[in-house]
Amino acid sequence: MGMRLFDRPLAPNPYEGLSPSATFTVVSQDLSNGLPMPKLHTAEGGNISPHLEWSGFPDQTESFFVSCFDPDAPTPSGFWHWMVIDIPVSCTSLARGAGSSDLELDGSAFHLRGDHGDHSYFGAAPPAGDRPHRYIFSVHALDIPTLGCDDDTSLAMYSFEALEHTIARATLTATYQTPSN
């Protein structure tokens, strides 16, 4: 008999194990750090990406990338819900719904394919009855304007390549739990 979902160990926050970097601030009109996300931003509630706005990043920042990662997904490697890369330094926010299409993004920014298979935001969708999952929304400040990746680059590979260029990071963590039926 296998382990029940709720009984598995809590996954670590993946950013706590990375080399230290400076921090800055990310806020949202839609999410509050440590609190449940509104249903609008879940897979069953509309799949609408939340508003994010950031400030206080280092002067040497040349671009950003934004991601949403669920370390609590019942997989060996968590679940990437969203990644937008090549965000110009002049862009310091993403509007609610910007995750629906590259057409909603500024300048050269574009989506990488998430673990759900599409180039867009995919809302919270933990298994019914599992404990609350953490959704870590991260804004990464990079010291280069682009890594030269295309939209077929995997999120894990992009994150790996971006590590040596990340000079600061801001995170906001929301939670969500799908009730048991």
What residue ranges belong to the model's regions?
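N-terminus-centered regions that define maturation/targeting leaders and the start
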Residues: 1-181
